[in-house]
């Protein structure tokens, strides 16, 4: 059963925001010192009452380093499976807008690596939302948080099983938020997911979002990939 937004909406009184980690690098470094990826844990008495999620989710972080392979830059930060643990994690890491240029966050179902080559992603694609640079301060964190709450709260009707994860790319030339799905050929499913995504993020009709196939992105020769679906769809005459 989907979790309503009211159940997953941020409650400041039940999440300790004192002494948050100043940088995501610190969160990653603290996990590097443990044998296994840590599980986020809420610290308040109220958190003893847990609200389980339908899936376990893993947060990944990437800080680009030209001297390292891409996979070596990718770190799994934490795994969680309750609403409370999500907020404990979210409140103690940097917001997307606070990340350095070239950094990414990935939130994927546990067991799915945030890369095109993963068997769960190889036939899939992504809904891509480009953040208006002039409205970055208002939109980036809003888009990212709304997307996170939507996927962990199973807000995509009966299509939750088709969703793999979410990504935010922080770039000086323009930030991007994306939602990855499992099968790029399921046009009806992906269209409905995109419609829900656009509504959740409150993106106006004047700003289209596009669905791109991973394989097309991996072999592109220019900066743009021809989308498989665009919302709103252009009228045919």
Please tell me what each predicted stretch does:
Residues 50-71:
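Short aromatic-glycine-(Arg/Gly/Cys) micro-motifs in beta-strand/loop hairpins
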Residues 71-96, 129:
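Extended catalytic/binding region for NAD+/ADP-ribose chemistry, centered on the ART fold
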Residues 102-119, 167-172, 176:
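Short, structured protein-protein interaction patches enriched in aromatics and acidic/basic residues
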Residues 5, 136, 140, 144-237:
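Intrinsically disordered, low-complexity, Lys/Arg-biased terminal tails
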Residues 123-133:
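Short glycine-/aliphatic-rich beta-strand segments at the starts of folded cytosolic domains
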Residues 1-44, 48-54, 201-204, 216-237:
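Long, polar low-complexity intrinsically disordered regions
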Residues 52-54, 72, 81-84, 102-103, ...:
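Eukaryote-biased feature marking scaffold/signaling PDZ-domain proteins and nuclear chromatin regulators
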Residues 43-46, 112-116, 152, 161-166:
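Eukaryotic intrinsically disordered and solvent-exposed regulatory patches
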């Amino acid at each position: 059963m989907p979790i309503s937004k009211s159940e997953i909406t941020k409650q400041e009184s039940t999440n300790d925001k004192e002494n948050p980690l100043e940088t995501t690098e610190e969160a990653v470094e603290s996990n590097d010192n443990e044998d296994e990826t840590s599980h986020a844990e809420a610290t308040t008495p109220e958190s003893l009452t847990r609200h389980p999620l339908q899936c376990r989710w893993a947060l990944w972080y990437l800080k680009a380093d030209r001297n390292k392979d891409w996979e070596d830059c990718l770190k799994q930060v934490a795994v969680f499976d309750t609403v409370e643990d999500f907020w404990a994690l979210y409140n103690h890491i940097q917001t997307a807008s606070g990340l350095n240029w070239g950094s990414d966050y990935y939130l994927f179902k546990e067991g799915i690596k945030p890369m095109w080559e993963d068997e769960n992603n190889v036939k899939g694609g992504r809904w891509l939302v480009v953040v208006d640079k002039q409205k970055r301060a208002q939109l980036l964190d809003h888009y990212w948080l709304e997307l996170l709450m939507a996927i962990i709260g199973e807000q995509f009707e009966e299509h939750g099983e088709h969703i793999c994860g979410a990504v935010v790319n922080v770039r000086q030339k323009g930030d991007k938020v994306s939602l990855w799905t499992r099968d790029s050929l399921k046009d009806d499913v992906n269209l409905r997911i995109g419609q829900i995504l656009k509504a959740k993020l409150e993106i106006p009709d004047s700003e289209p979002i596009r669905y791109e196939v991973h394989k097309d992105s991996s072999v592109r020769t220019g900066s743009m990939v021809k989308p498989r679906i665009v919302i709103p769809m252009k009228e045919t005459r």
